[in-house]
Amino acid sequence: MQFLDFLIALLPALFWGSVVLINVFVGGGPYNQIRGTTLGALIVGLGLLITGFAKFNNPTVIIVGLISGALWAFGQANQLKSISLIGVSNTMPVSTGMQLVGTTLFSVIFLGEWSSMTQIIFGLIAMILLVTGVALTSLKAKNERQSDNPEFKKAMGILIVSTVGYVGFVVLGDIFGVGGTDALFFQSVGMAIGGFILSMNHKTSLKSTALNLLPGVIWGIGNLFMFYSQPKVGVATSFSLSQLLVIVSTLGGIFILGERKDRRQMTGIWAGIIIIVIAAIILGNLK
């Protein structure tokens, strides 16, 4: 593995972790944010179409791409709703943990990914670590009863719904063997359609939507770096490194967006992030 290839493999985490930070920074609320983000992803998809990476000779790629893209938009829209309630630093570790648990359980139960006792043992260890990490990142501040906070409870319910969309986005591609740059254009079309449907009955503005194009472009470019790095460093390594996005988004929420945390919460966040990343590395190497 070349050092440059390793650095490029880190870029998806940087790009994907920055998406929600830019969404919140430019503002506009979750409906402008999802519409703008999905249209931004479509811009990258159109670039692939123009350069000849989108092929129309495989109906499976087209259909799976469209549906999985719409599912991603559903997951992202609900994640943005959670962020509007409890912030980036509270949402992203929980969302990342839920996604890893959801995709892993589906792959194990329905796709038979863990076929050996070693995989089962290490997989269960990783799942326990994920739950522990998520719990640590969600520690309440002193004198705060977070479990009685209606916004926190509502956000957790929204994140469960969000996870369904994200898991569907990932596992559909696995089930039908669809992925890579061939599918990205059709996924981006599905995202744009999904983003429009999800926001059509809500008040949006052209300015706020336009400002949120950038996160979508960044998300699409992060995907391209992922596709480049997988054959260079391996699927397991690229997957594990991409999960470092939770560090970028969580710490960005605290230090860039100014979300306040006390010492106890910061200790829990650092410990939780490290544990979630370790679990992601274990899961990545079980693939």
Swiss-Prot record:
The principal localisation class reads: membrane
Against SUPFAM superfamilies, the record matches this protein to: Multidrug resistance efflux transporter EmrE
Q: Name one GO cellular component term.
A: plasma membrane
Q: Which GO terms describe its molecular function?
A: carbohydrate transmembrane transporter activity
Keyword check for Transmembrane helix, yes or no: yes
Transmembrane segment boundaries: 7-29, 34-53, 60-77, 114-136, 157-179, 184-201, 208-230, 235-257, 269-286
- Source organism superkingdom: Bacteria
Keyword annotations = Cell membrane, Membrane, Sugar transport, Transmembrane, Transmembrane helix, Transport
Membrane-topology annotation of the record: Multi-pass membrane protein
Please tell me whether the keyword RNA-binding is annotated for this protein.
no
* Matches recorded under InterPro entries: Sugar_transport
Cellular compartments annotated: Cell membrane
User: What's the stated role of this polypeptide?
Assistant: Involved in the uptake of glucose.
Give the family from UniProt.
Belongs to the GRP transporter (TC 2.A.7.5) family.
Protein name, per record: Probable glucose uptake protein GlcU
Question: Can you name the source organism?
Answer: Staphylococcus aureus (strain Mu50 / ATCC 700699)
